[in-house]
Amino acid sequence: MKTIRKIFTGFSVALLLGGCNLLDVKPNIITEETFYTSSSQAQLALNGVYGVLNSWQLYGCNLILDLNYNSDIVQYMSTTNATMKGASFEIDANSDDVYQTWTWLYKGIRNANAFLENIEGTDFDPEGKMVAQARFLRAYYYFILAQNWINVPLRLKAIDSYSNVKCPATPQLQVMQFAASEMEKCLETITDDLTFAPSDVTKTTVEGILARVYLYMAGEAVEGTTAEQKHEYFGKAADYARMVIESGKHQLNPDYAQVFINMIGDKYDKEYYESMWEADFLGDRSSPDYYGNSRWGELNGLRSSNCGTNFSEMNTNFAYGLFSNTIKLWELYMDDDRTKLEKNLSVVTDKRQQWTLPPYHYNGTGEESWVYPYGGDPSDARKLIAGIDKTPYYTSGAELKDRNSTNKEETYYPGSRYCGKFRREVQYEGRKNFKSIWCGINVPLLRYSDVLLMYAEAMNEYMGTPSEDLYNVILPLRERAGISTEPYSKYASYEKFQQFIRNERARELCFEGLRKFDLLRWGIYVKSMQDLTTRAGTGTWSTSTARNYIILCSRLSEKNNCLPIPSLELAVNTELKQNHLW
């Protein structure tokens, strides 16, 4: 399902989603002379503000995968990569991936500023809905900048020449306060119609992101906040999350896997609207109308790069699969917050684990091996051709179980499984692509389940104590996952409920690019990763991937709580200073 924003053709593809740089085309590409002679041209200009989301530099790879994916539950499986320096903690101020992400965020801001300046005085947006979207996106880009670089230049006018690029940094807290204030102003005129959701921003999208912004501002990662401000921000986060809940416009899809199958197949859920906002991507670049900039699902999918000459026969599209879970995520599913009875019944498995950490990939080695068929029984064994069929995890010589099982077997790679949440299986993607790293899987930016979790967390922090009502907000997530929950009395203290929510966020939202920023706002990003290295390389987590985690964390320090300001930016904007952590 496509909206006008996703059907970029000709000019807009080349301009926004291709390899060219907006500033390389023309210093002031969005002008009154170029656009704004019709409502359709104004819409195209607004597309230019949205289009940055769909770039390789943001949600196609750099921002979400390269620079911010590693955490205590997700790890980069290698230790070095020339094009993934962020994932291997080898970046510095000269790194191109850092520069490109910084630049494209400011492109989005520049496009928004130009749009807001040029739409003024026209009658193409009589209700102010387009202006509200542009203002929200500009605020969102500033929120991302302040999260990643702390103190950043706050530009509210389009740069009309290369002579006025000098601008000092604004403190992080002020940038985030500006972002929150702008988003709040958007609520007055932005549409509450979900017709074009989750591609377009709507009122509940803004409310949900406001909950995220205020929750982040209330945490430990933002410099300069007082205790009184933190308390206020927790309250505002709860208020905005509550508004989404009380709107009645969003529900949990009863099938957890279907939420992501929709994204894989480029389908919008028009029944439940659990996915509230997505970054849309088109495809594998096999044709001009199937041109995309995303490696989402390819870099963080089930590995299928051992293709050989039989790629056309494979039941999956191409994926390098460079990220896996850690042992901590496995144990969060299998042990933490599980009832005693279900811990002893290995057949009772969290459905989120089944979908996210499947016991197979598509990268088998060797010519042929006898295995059980997927979902079949041992009496119907057949030959598996490596790479074409699912390649199960098992220890050499061990009895191979049904490949759809996720029973707790320590020999079944519990801490080194590829991410299955955005798998590129043909049955879900809807087509067999040519052998390409590019794909059209959409990236979730906000889900209703996240709103529920933010509400429960913010209220616990604001009140200093949980309640059974907050506990009941979380229960539907676990009921959908098919697991039982201990009674409220087990989580009735502030500390226990806080940890329960933190664990539940990992189980529900893993591999969606949120965990690092959760750890940052809790003030435990570096510590949580380095503490986990004591487990790596031993016991049930003794794979080479686990040993790589030790190497990655040896490069980790407090400076990795943020990114360095690019050297090229510092050379041009001489009023800007390098981040103090770098």
Regions found by a protein language model. Name each.
Residues S39, Q43-Q57, S78-W149, N164-Q177, ...:
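Conserved, well-structured interaction surfaces
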Residues M1-C20:
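Sec-dependent bacterial lipoprotein signal peptides
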Residues G19-C20, V74-M77, D92-S95, L105-Y106, ...:
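Long, intrinsically disordered, low-complexity segments
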Residues N21-N81, M176, E184-K185, T204-E207, ...:
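An aromatic- and glycine-enriched ligand-binding surface/loop that stacks and positions planar moieties
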Residues D123, I144-P153, L194, Y216-T225, ...:
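Short coil/turn linking the two alpha-helices of tandem helical-hairpin repeats
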Residues K351-L475:
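C-terminal substrate/ligand-recognition segments
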